[in-house]
Amino acid sequence: MASLSESEGTNRGSMWELDQNLDQPMDEEASRLKNMYREKKFSSLLLLRLAFQSLGVVFGDLGTSPLYVFYNAFPHGVDDEEDVIGALSLIIYTLTLIPLLKYVFVVLRANDNGQGGTFALYSLLCRHAKISTIPNQHKTDEDLTTYSRQTYEENSVGAKIKRWLEAHAYKRNCLLIVVLIGTCTAIGDGILTPAISVLSASGGIKVQNPNMSTDVVVIVSVIILIGLFSMQHYGTDKVGWLFAPIVLLWFILIGSVGALNIHKYKGSVLKAYNPVYIYRYFQRRNSDSWASLGGIMLSITGTEALFADLCHFPVFAIQIAFTLIVFPCLLLAYTGQAAYIIAHKDHVADAFYRSIPDSIYWPAFVIATAAAIVASQATISATYSIIKQALALGCFPRVKIVHTSKKFLGQIYIPDINWVLLILCIAVTAGFKNQSQIGNAYGTAVVIVMLVTTFLMVPIMLLVWKSHWILVVTFIVLSLMVEIPYFSACLLKIDQGGWVPLVIATAFFIIMYVWHFCTVKRYEFEMHSKVSMAWILGLGPSLGLVRVPGIGFVYTELASGVPHIFSHFITNLPAIHSVVVFVCVKYLPVYTVPMDERFLVRRIGPKNFHIFRCVARYGYKDLHKKDEDFEKMLFNCLLSFLRLESMMEGYSDSDDFSVPEQRTEGSISNAFLAEKTNNNTMCSNGDLSYSSQDSIVPVQSPLRGNSLLRYSSQASHTVSDELEFLNRCKDAGVVHILGNTIVLARRDSGIIKKIAVNYMYAFMRKICRENSVIFNVPHESLLNVGQIYYI
């Protein structure tokens, strides 16, 4: 392989070297002095306040589990007191091992600068190994202040894992498949959580009216669900302050009722805290005990949402809220319910509501319904965030995303997804009509997401944390010791409702994987079809055409090279704009890109060609908002670049460095090859960087007061002329040139690929948002260039 690469290098010739000099990707000249990410420090009072607020956002789903756990564990009733004790013991130690130890004290630490969820874990891995979803990244992206990653010694475990992941494409593809499975199943949670929470809370109506039909409860639940999803476009900004008090009141209620029932009925239920009763439970009930695990597992539903909703609060605040309020109240609630069920074995179906004293029954019903709505809202919001992350990383069709709050960036609303969730949620609620089958479906979804998180934590601990292998093995053993039995129990209930999340996850997986596959293949086609810069510059300053006044923004996913649509454009039209800017908008595996680091601008070729490249970088949390004028931002970037470029040319330490304004076609190659050794000449001051022909300046960066830059009169005159020329071109008109491509499978492709590309991907592209809408391009300034890509 070495000899082959060497022979290729010798055969490339001077034209290849010229192309590399003229149009290098945004390379090391774009490096900047970074402000390292530092975790914010909070005062004790602020931490307590944030811990209180986290109750309404993070813990609603986990807190409403006592509404339906015991019924799903014993759908056919309870025969023996020991069964209840054994089930309670399982609940206690499941809550201890999974939410408390695994998530609160381990997984929450694996956040991406405060962002949680499956894609946050994946973005961490993408930064520490070259496994990004779309291969248009470059090493300059690593210079972002939010692009933190570790370095490894050559023979360390982390370095070996990194090389193993990067070695073959199929390994990276398998990792992506695992991430998509977890993501799609988490989306299923956004359907099942509102269904089971609202249906369980509404069931309290029937407890006081035994003769009431089950259909009435279902109708009430559907009405609540319709109201909940219909209000999503208003956002939670105005009513969000109510969530924390409601959930706190809920935890106080279930904790107090639990303590009352322990005192009133069987205090001996406390022996369930002895794990020996878990062994006795399985020994006595055999296969029945294993089947009941599917219901017991519902006691930890909402745990994954605890991680997914992490972005709103610091880790320590969530740890305080869970250990001081959530965990003790849940233990009291389940223990009190167990005591009540032992005394009233025939009330297991409605154990929660029947255990409430009559004097506070209806206030408790109102609080339970409100808590169920809050829990559903938190899961729906988490689903929006998951889809936004998937969309940013090229794994979901471009759907409309709406900001619902001017204060909080994370509060979004996705109309198309909202109505899909509503339809599926109503179908599940009205179709099953009871908690048992929905619970079976819910349990299957939850345990799959947890298994995916466990799997992803292994490379996180080795690559990111550099943990000792003994700690990694301990984490895996303790996690799988709980999750594998629960997963096997859920598989036993596939035919009793467990198939629902599998069908939902499969449908979303097909959509996401087909979209990602075709997006990557389309990018690879563009890479292979890109035009050499040497060829473009060989056409001369006029590009062999008439240069008409105006600015042309040519949008492309390529961070280097000239897209094929541009050569197609100049081949079929006799004119091109006086100023051409290749615009690349790309998302990186970071949660956000600061505004002062978002744009990178460089000049391509000699000045009289007036060709530039602008790369706009976004994180998966960033959004293109409607009030952003993308065209204005791009133009300001160009102006800033020209001013800073002129400053660097006039710098006193660069006297023997010059940028020729004009070169003849024949002199371009020799001049650049002669200057190759000086091509990395760079003058930097703080966070401003510049080099000769490959000029890269991060715009919107603050200039330091002690700067030593000075103008020469000639440079000042030149930049004034160019700025004036650029403004005249803007006044003449700006045109946005986008590729209107049709993607088709090659004729020799298999039938599955043809169906995926020619029909599924084509349909999704037809119904999703166009780039012109995403970038807010005025219709009168839009020019589409049609092409067919065969992938």
UniProtKB/Swiss-Prot annotation:
Protein name: Probable potassium transporter 11
A Pfam family recorded for this sequence: K_trans_C
Location, primary (coarse class): membrane
Family listed: Belongs to the HAK/KUP transporter (TC 2.A.72.3) family.
Iron found in the keyword field: no
Recorded GO CC terms: membrane
Free-text function comment from the UniProt entry: High-affinity potassium transporter.
Gene: HAK11
Disulfide bonds: none
Side Cytoplasmic, residues: 1-49, 109-175, 237-238, 311-315, 381-411, 466-468, 518-791
Subcellular location: Membrane
Extracellular compartment spans: 71-87, 197-215, 260-289, 339-359, 433-444, 490-496
GO biological process assignments: potassium ion transport
Ranges annotated as spanning the membrane: 50-70, 88-108, 176-196, 216-236, 239-259, 290-310, 316-338, 360-380, 412-432, 445-465, 469-489, 497-517
InterPro entries: K+_transporter, K_trans_C, K_trans_N
GO molecular function terms attached to this record: potassium ion transmembrane transporter activity
Keyword vocabulary terms for this entry: Glycoprotein, Ion transport, Membrane, Potassium, Potassium transport, Transmembrane, Transmembrane helix, Transport
Glycosylation sites: N211, N434
Membrane topology of this protein: Multi-pass membrane protein
Provenance organism: Oryza sativa subsp. japonica (Rice)
